[in-house]
Amino acid sequence: QGPFGPGCEEAGCPEGSACNIITDRCTCPEVRCRVYCSHGFQRSRYGCEVCRCRTEPMKATCDISECPEGMMCSRLTNKCDCKIDINCRKTCPNGLKRDKLGCEYCECKPKRKLVPRLS
């Protein structure tokens, strides 16, 4: 998912990539493409490079003023992404809660209630 969707531990990752448990974001597989692209490769909705050329150069960095409050400009994807709270020392068995933008904050998710399945 993009920066506004659930993290990869909850939503999974596309084929060929893995979930980084520290950032809760998908890591991108290496692009193996025999095409030279003067402006670099296009990116998928996950922010991973794909074997298609960009038609114009990518901006050096996105503008922080373009990002909603509580988010930052990612140099990797040139998109607004969640800030990671490096001061949060909580160990949460069900993960951290997320705000309305899909960003984690330093509060544990409650225990999941088990609902019996009907046969």
UniProtKB/Swiss-Prot annotation:
Extra facts: Binds to heparin-agarose, binds to sulfated glycoconjugates.
Subcellular location, record wording: Secreted
Protein name, per record: Ghilanten
Binding site for heparin: 97-100, 111-118
Keyword Secreted: yes
Main location: secreted
Stretches assigned to the Antistasin-like domain: 28-53, 83-108
Pfam families, sorted: Antistasin (PF02822)
Keywords: Disulfide bond, Heparin-binding, Protease inhibitor, Pyrrolidone carboxylic acid, Repeat, Secreted, Serine protease inhibitor
Superkingdom field: Eukaryota
One of the GO BP terms on file: negative regulation of coagulation
GO molecular function: heparin binding; serine-type endopeptidase inhibitor activity
A single GO cellular-component term on record: extracellular region
Site (Reactive bond): 34-35, 89-90
Family in the record: Belongs to the protease inhibitor I15 (antistasin) family.
Cysteines joined through disulfide linkages: 8-19, 13-26, 28-48, 33-51, 37-53, 62-73, 67-80, 82-103, 88-106, 92-108
Sites bearing Pyrrolidone carboxylic acid, chain numbering: 1
Function (record text): This highly disulfide-bonded protein is a potent inhibitor of factor Xa. May have therapeutic utility as an anticoagulant. Also exhibits a strong metastatic activity.
